């Protein structure tokens, strides 16, 4: 049975994402009944549990449409022993504002929320709970637990956590931006990636020596091969001012020849390349890598002494 660490306690959006990944059969080698969810106190703790052998996988948020990348996840993937992404899922994120049974909005003096959640409901809170003092929480479920234990009057939380703790809902489906979505990934120790599906994502972390044009040259390895680069982001290495590593996502799989060639070129060009995985996305995240089948056939013919007749077009 696969032990999967996630940001707890029970009732977080991460738990909901884990349920979704499990139901879709995306946990390698496991069915829906072969998973044991293991709540931990934070995203870095979930990834450390995999590194330490306390969990087989971790389910962690990596990107949301409001605030962008989840930097604790990126930083934890970039340092320490290597880890690899095997699956992803996306959740529509809308929050519940909950209180203990019997309380109304007029009774709310303190509001528990994790920082990311508070940022996504700021306008609603300003309009409806303007006088409430914010109490920090380490997860959406922890915010609900604070209300259940009497440490806060209200919480910004998930519907799952509201039900888990038996709280009343002041408002449901609360979010300042109606298209708020969060992407979660399933992370484990390095292993052969899931098979190519034709709708895949590949991710790497690049360390590039500081030289004029070095970053442009590295990114050109994607462009010259017709690979759709969907994300490029820098994060400090924490070793000195102005020293950064770069995260890059592209459409395609390591078994796609253009992607494989780009990765080999990056390995030659960069000071270090950390492969974060190739995994299915369900639907293509952008333009697919160009097919190389015709070029492979042409090269094989040339090697066999059977070149294309003069003037004959490949197209």
Curated annotation (Swiss-Prot):
Keyword terms, alphabetized: Amino-acid biosynthesis, Aromatic amino acid biosynthesis, Lyase, Phenylalanine biosynthesis
Source domain of life is: Bacteria
- Pathway this chain belongs to: Amino-acid biosynthesis; L-phenylalanine biosynthesis; phenylpyruvate from prephenate: step 1/1
| GO CC annotation | cytoplasm
Which InterPro entries does this UniProt record tie to the protein? ACT-like_dom_sf, ACT_dom, Chor_mutase/pphenate_deHydtase, Preph_deHydtase, Preph_deHydtase_CS
Q: Where is the ACT domain?
A: 203-280
Q: Which GO terms describe its molecular function?
A: prephenate dehydratase activity; protein homodimerization activity
Q: Which Gene3D superfamilies match?
A: 3.30.70.260, Periplasmic binding protein-like II
Q: Where is this site: Essential for activity?
A: 182
Asked if Hydrolase is a keyword of the record, the answer is: no
Catalytically driven reaction(s): prephenate + H(+) = 3-phenylpyruvate + CO2 + H2O
Q: Where is the Prephenate dehydratase domain?
A: 3-189
EC main group: lyase
**Tell me, which GO biological process terms does this entry list?**
L-phenylalanine biosynthetic process
Give the EC number(s) listed in the UniProt record: 4.2.1.51
The protein's assembly and partners: Homodimer.
What protein name is recorded for this chain? Answer: Prephenate dehydratase
